[in-house]
Design a protein with these regions (language model features):
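Tryptophan (W) side chains
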Residues: 13-16, 37
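A short beta-loop-alpha structural element at the N-terminal edge
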Residues: 21-24, 45-60, 198-215
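Active-site rim helix/loop that mediates acceptor-substrate recognition in acyltransferases
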Residues: 61, 65, 70-94, 98-100, ...
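Conserved beta-strand in the GNAT
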Residues: 96, 102-111, 119-121, 126, ...
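Conserved acetyl-CoA-binding loop-helix of GNAT-fold acetyltransferases
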Residues: 127, 133-146, 172-173, 273-286
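Conserved active-site alpha-helix within GNAT-family acetyltransferase domains
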Residues: 134, 138, 162-180, 278, ...
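Conserved GNAT acetyl-CoA-binding A-motif
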Residues: 148-159, 290-301
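Conserved catalytic-core motifs of GNAT/GCN5-like acyltransferases
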Residues: 159-161, 177-190, 317-328
């Protein structure tokens, strides 16, 4: 079934859908059915693509994700905008779909070095309900490509829920390929607090330099959201702690209370299976904002059985599964 847009009588735009095996009825061309699009609205104009306006993004996000598979109703504006800051969003190259002055769709894009290449990250793509299945998501993506190429961006990356098959197919048509599976887990705070203490391990604040010194200890490459440069993107919003054994740095954690986001948990290979990771997780409970009931560990490489088993032993349970998808620009 094809879809598209065409102009009807002055001031009215319609969406058409071609049904190859269906007749349109008397008086209507057989090749297409014309479905009037929001005719009840006055002064309807053809949506235009312009840069996303930061002050309109939150309202548009909440509308676009009001029926999303994961409940977004509790997302706060301050937290959403901080996440965009963490991901180095550039609103000037993030295309927005506007119906008049109203933002009804968007692809919000962050740019940073990741895996040895300047990379664009799709922080969020969303459309208000009346603007879906009309090809706008593809148009937004295509609109962003020239500016990204001018910036020297070599790759585009995104994450998508595995259950969102229509989105996966749409991304594949745009040239994206599945790079890996990502697991998202969640634990009750009470479970973290109840973790057993680890004797002989001193957990205390650490510097960004100390945290970066263990970067090579990572058993898998972090996703864009959890990249190590995040520690520099929002330094005042991240609590970095180190686990020390005999004065030697054995592991680090990085957690953002404002986002309730576990960014990094690393243990030196020489100190694994000694309770270092457990001590760091237990310590994170001291940073949690008041009223926080859950802590999530997001975007763990699906092939990292050891890491997944560790989180499982600490009381974490499956939340959702995602795919990381990439394409060259």
């Amino acid at each position: 079934m094809e879809t598209g847009t065409a102009q009807g009588r002055p001031g009215v735009w319609v969406a058409w859908r071609r049904h190859p095996d269906r007749t349109a009825g008397p008086g209507v061309p057989q090749r297409a059915l014309l479905v009037l699009w929001n005719l009840s609205r006055k002064n309807l104009r053809m949506p235009t693509i312009e840069p996303v306006r930061r002050d309109q993004y939150y309202e548009a996000f909440m509308e676009a994700f009001s029926d999303y598979a994961m409940d977004a109703s509790g997302v706060q504006e301050e937290r959403l905008l901080l996440r965009m800051e963490k991901n180095k969003v550039d609103y000037d190259i993030s295309p927005g779909l506007y119906d008049g002055n109203r933002l009804v769709g968007f692809t919000v894009i962050g740019i940073d070095a990741w895996e040895g290449m300047l990379t664009a990250y799709d922080c969020a793509t969303g459309l208000a309900a009346n603007y879906r299945k009309l090809g706008w998501a593809r148009k937004l993506f295509d609109h962003a490509l020239p500016a990204l190429r001018q910036r020297g961006v070599g790759r585009f990356v995104l994450e998508v829920l595995q259950q969102n098959e229509p989105a996966i197919k749409a991304y594949e048509k745009s040239g994206f390929e599945i790079a890996r599976e990502l697991k998202c887990l969640s634990s009750d705070v009470e479970t973290l607090v109840a973790l057993p203490p680890s004797g002989g391990i001193d957990v205390r604040p650490a510097t960004r330099e100390e945290a970066r010194s263990l970067e090579a200890a990572a058993s898998f490459a972090p996703c864009f959201e959890n990249r190590f440069s995040t520690l520099d993107a929002i330094p005042e919003q991240v609590c970095i702690d180190g686990a020390f054994i005999g004065g030697q740095l054995a592991g680090v954690s990085a957690y953002s209370p404002a986002l309730n986001w576990l960014l990094t948990l690393l243990v030196s290979p020489d100190h694994r299976r000694k309770g270092v990771g457990t001590a760091l997780l237990k310590n994170i409970s001291t940073h949690l904002p008041e009223g926080t009931s859950k802590l999530a560990a997001l975007d763990i490489d699906g092939e990292e059985d050891g890491m997944l088993a560790f989180f499982g032993s600490c009381g974490f349970e499956p939340l959702v599964d995602q795919y990381e998808m990439t394409r060259e620009i």
